[in-house]
Regions:
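Structural detector for helix-capping/boundary residues
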Residues: 5-8, 122, 151, 156
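Generic recognition of well-ordered alpha-helical segments
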Residues: 49, 53, 57-60, 94, ...
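Acidic donor-binding helix in nucleotide-sugar-dependent glycosyltransferases
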Residues: 1-4, 136
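DNA/chromatin major-groove-contacting recognition/catalytic segments
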Residues: 28-33, 130, 151, 155-172
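Conserved tyrosine-mediated DNA breakage-rejoining catalytic core shared by Y-recombinases
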Residues: 4-63, 70-74
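Short functional hotspots where side chains directly engage DNA or cofactors
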Residues: 14-19, 115, 126, 138-156, ...
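Residue-level detector of conserved, well-ordered beta-strand and adjacent loop positions
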Residues: 20, 48, 80-82, 154
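Short, basic (Lys/Arg/His-rich) helix/loop patches that form interaction surfaces
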Residues: 45, 61-86, 90-139, 143-146
Length: 172
C-alpha cells in the first residue's frame, strides 16, 4: 500500500492517508495497479505527527520528473527509484535485506529476517497492546474480519500478558 500512494492520497490538513490502491510489479507485467485485497482495504488512515512530518519531507524531496509515470491511469507516486519510476514493495524488501547484511557483517551476529510484512505485524501488535479497540484496529489494518487482525496479526508474549494483568489486578 505504501508504494501505491500518490500526492493526492495525502491530506496534510486532516492528517489522513487515503488508501485506494496497491502498486505491483511482476516478471510478466512491469507495473500495474490493483485495489487492496478486500473492500475494507480501501480506507482513510489517520497520520501521527511523526508520519505527517515524514511524508512532508518525502513530498518536498521528491524530484520532479520530466515525464510522470502513468500506471493504469494513476500518476504522482510518492516513492520513485533513481530512474524516476515508481518503487514497489520489492525495493523496500531489498533495502531491508541490505541493512540486515551490513548489520550481520559489522557485528558478526545473525539477525532475524525483517520484512515490511513483519513490520505490519509489529505495528498491529504494538497498537493493540497500547489499548486500541479491536474494531478500530481492524479498520486501520484494512481487514474485512476482526479474526484476521486478532488471530494472524497480533501476537502476545508472557511479558505483555503480565503487564496487562497487572493493570487490571486491582479491580479483581
Amino acid at each position: 500500500e505504501l508504494y501505491g500512494l500518490t500526492r493526492a492520497d495525502i491530506d496534510f490538513e486532516r492528517h489522513c492517508i487515503h488508501v485506494r490502491r496497491q502498486l505491483c510489479r511482476t516478471a510478466e507485467k512491469p507495473y500495474f495497479v490493483t485495489p487492496p485485497k478486500t473492500k475494507s482495504g480501501i480506507r482513510n488512515v489517520p497520520m501521527t505527527d511523526t508520519v505527517c512530518a515524514a511524508l512532508r519531507r518525502v513530498v518536498k524531496a521528491r524530484a520532479s520528473t520530466k515525464v510522470e509515470a502513468l500506471v493504469d491511469g494513476c500518476s504522482g507516486f510518492l516513492f520513485l527509484d533513481k530512474s524516476g519510476m515508481p518503487k514497489v514493495a520489492m525495493h523496500l524488501e531489498n533495502y531491508m535485506r541490505g541493512v540486515q547484511g551490513k548489520f550481520e557483517k559489522a557485528y558478526g551476529k545473525p539477525v532475524p529476517r525483517i520484512t515490511p510484512h513483519v513490520l505490519r505485524h509489529t505495528f498491529c501488535t504494538n497498537v493493540q497492546q497500547a489499548g486500541l479497540d479491536v474494531k478500530s484496529l481492524q479498520y486501520l489494518m484494512g481487514h474485512s474480519n476482526a479474526s484476521v487482525t486478532l488471530d494472524v496479526y497480533t501476537h502476545s508474549s508472557f511479558e505483555s500478558v503480565e503487564r496487562a494483568f497487572e493493570q487490571i489486578a486491582g479491580n479483581l
